[in-house]
Amino acid sequence: MRLKQDFFEQLPEFYSQVFPLGISNPHWLAWSQDAADLIEIKQPSDELLQGLSGNAHVDGASYYAQVYSGHQFGGYSPQLGDGRSIILGEALGPQGAWDVALKGAGPTPYSRHGDGRAVMRSAVREFLISEALHHLHIPTTRALAVIGSDLPVWRESQETAAITVRLAKSHIRFGHFEYFCHSERGAPAKLKQLLDFTIKQHYPDLSCDAVGYKAWFTRVVADTAKMIANWQAIGFAHGVMNTDNMSILGDTFDFGPFAFLDTFKEGFICNHSDPEGRYAFGQQPGIGLWNLQRLAQALSPIIASDDLIESLNQYQVELVKHYLLLMRGKLGLKTSAAEAEQDDHDLALIGAFTGLMERNQLDHTNTWRRFGQLDPNASHSSLRDDFVDLHGFDTWYQAYQVRLGSVDEVGLWQKERNQVNPKYILRNYLAQEAIIAVELGDLKPLHNLQRLLQNPFDEQLEFEDMAKRPPDWGQGLIMSCSS
């Protein structure tokens, strides 16, 4: 692993240097070779295990925790920072550099009286969701590995510590900019320093001047809108959309009590700490804009207000455009021109179908997958049998067929639907079963689940049971932020 230290060397006021404590009896629990290839690691090794567990120094590593602030559940927290994540530096690879971070490596100056550790269950969940989202083609940070230990840690009860090795194209968050705006820490000079660094590292085609700043913020708005459109189309609820959990690159970031939808429910809440549903599934598009507005506020000392507002006004446009692209793919709809009238018609058609799904309490993923078995030219649809409200479905299906038109190659059309409507997602109960098995010393369910998630659009008949609706105990599991 070849490391460079651009952030560490160029932004000394944006972090504190801190070294990992190490863990006892480190051992590999999970490994992603896909992620390893990004930074040219051929295979796991004992030497790498000792380095990534914090028990030995990694050549070229600087070890630091970044500082930032953020809006958490709508309220501003003036100092947050990496409370249990220690970054080694940026590892070089064929697709560019990736930050390497040890999540759960011990306390930092930003731990806020915490122990700086991560428990095994949260480490495994982050690993699995990183694999799942990547293979669903949704922008995300990656997880290289989970390292287990026999180190006890206390949450609600005694658990075992683990480390997630996270890879990110950048760890810069909306909250980094907020930290240097809402303080006496040298803004706007520090804001400009951070923004220029971000542009040079990740948007090298842009200039570090007023024109480049506006173009950059416009891209951040568009990338954030696309990320959230992906979430809404696939049925993913992040759970903790605080501004310190928002990547400046539009990557899904900082996983806690996330969930995929089981039964479709617009108001689904996956976070036990969010009883009012601020971050409910259906609220995510609006929260995305709210967070971008907080970022714009932080940038206002160095970017003209008119430029910020103009870029923010593109959020809804980009969100709808990308959402329609994804949902038309799921339904097999073609469009030759992006006319507003057609867009409005298709949004109404999509909304009518998701409304039917909710009223009939249908499984989100399985219902969309059924389009791969549908004969779109037939007057009677096998999909109809899933609905209790037959009249509602018939009315919708008639409108759908009119919009769809005649399909010449039904087999090809069905195959295309199966390439965008996954058969398998990371259901919370599947993750929980894998975690329980790990606690009992059995890694096979975890590794099988990882293999399943690497090919979510394939039939994988040996894992057929994992596509079924959850058992009663696993339906709509709500997780806590405890990790």
UniProtKB/Swiss-Prot annotation:
GO terms for molecular function: AMPylase activity; ATP binding; magnesium ion binding. It comes from Shewanella pealeana (strain ATCC 700345 / ANG-SQ1). It is an enzyme of class 2 (transferase). Mg(2+) binds at N245, D254. Its EC number is 2.7.7.-, 2.7.7.108. Nucleotidyltransferase involved in the post-translational modification of proteins. It can catalyze the addition of adenosine monophosphate (AMP) or uridine monophosphate (UMP) to a protein, resulting in modifications known as AMPylation and UMPylation. The gene is ydiU. This is Protein nucleotidyltransferase YdiU. Disulfide bonds: none annotated. Keywords: ATP-binding, Magnesium, Manganese, Metal-binding, Nucleotide-binding, Nucleotidyltransferase, Transferase. Its cofactor is Mg(2+); Mn(2+). ATP binds at G81, G83, R84, K103, D115, G116, R166, R173, D254. HAMAP family: YdiU_SelO.
